[in-house]
Amino acid sequence: QMEQQDLLDQPEQMEQQDLLDQPEQMEQQDQPDLPDQQDQTEQPDQQDRQDLLDQQDRSMTEHKYKVVVYAICKNEEKFVERWYESVKEADEIYVLDTGSTDDTVKKLKECGIHVKTKVFKPWRFDVARNESLKMVPDDTDICICTDLDEVFMPGWRKELEKYWQPDTTRARYNYNWSLDENNNPIVNFYLDKIHTKKDYKWTHPVHEVLTALKEERVVTIDSITLNHYPDHEKSRSSYLPLLELSVKEDPENDRNVHYLGREYMYYHKWNRCIDTLIKHLSLKTATWKDERAASMRFIARSYFHLKRYREAEMWLKLAIEEAPYLRDGYTELAFLYYSQEEYEKCIHTALQALKIKTHPKTYINEVMSFDGTLYDLLAISSFRLKQYDYAVYWNAIALEYKPDDVRLQNNHQVYLQKEANPND
């Protein structure tokens, strides 16, 4: 009996001037201002001397900007050393611990990191982020917010200084939200949590965003990459009530209404998901086609699980119409047809999906659209239609994506046997 995959329940796809590498020879006016030698009546205290030495030290290095990393954490002792190694190119590192009961704080201090502890009740991500941002010194030129389960690829500091301009307020960079066992990106998009200090604040209780307080000047730096290695043991149970609070506080915020509907889907609250995402689509500010199409796909998934397959088909067709340049709507429609044993429609739809070669760098992209699943569906559907040569052909391509997949390997043997002896 051939196994079938339920591709509809997917994990969250996450909540993206060429300068010389070295500054020119320093001139005299680049030196820091020294104390007035004429006035010896008031000597600088020890802290003032240290600040002056720090300022002079920075002026004599290759770095043009003061770069500070900041983060929040709780019970993440197993990530501390790896995270520190990836961010230590910064001038200073500040971490706000929100109530760890393990050795997180101890390990952070052993790395020389500035640590403060504060417990927030009730918990909100934006409040904690803003509190951690307060720890960053006011003379910081560039702030970088990361989490302890993330790792910068080496050399990010040099690339940041290469592309950051005096009037830049924010930088976008590559974020690998999910990676395979060989450290190859599965889900990749731009992240933009590198910023100036005084021009931003964090907003929203969960899926918090960095909100600009003035006009932005954003630079995209493709040569900076941040990898995400999540702790799958951590609970995300707080997300749903925080999202409900977020939408209650700002019911017209299309982004958070979309996130809330998606969260209902993850909790299998199908009717709430449908109602919430229909509301998202009705909002005047909900204009981003990728996200609108995602809401339509999630509505379709909910109808699928309610066994209302024609409504699911209708919403997937609407998703394709909304964003015909994305594979995702076609992929899920192909799966719907496959699950309903409409194999000719499955093949036609999967082939339409494969005509789309672009893979946008946004958080809204489904792994199954680019991981060989379409070839798997083509192979099984071809087999059901007794097109055994096509089944072999398509499954061979699926195996190129997943050579160690036992199900695909077993299916391939079945396809080969049927191709050789179609009447058996």
Annotated model-derived regions:
Residues 78-81, 102-111, 155:
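Acidic helix N-cap motif at the loop->helix transition within catalytic regions
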Residues 68-92:
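Short, well-formed alpha-helical segments that are part of the catalytic scaffolds
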Residues 130-142:
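Active-site nucleotide-sugar/metal-binding loop of Leloir-type enzymes
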Residues 86, 96-109, 120-122, 147-150:
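A conserved acidic beta->alpha catalytic loop
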Residues 126-133, 152-275:
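Catalytic-site signature of metal-activated, phosphate-bearing donor transferases
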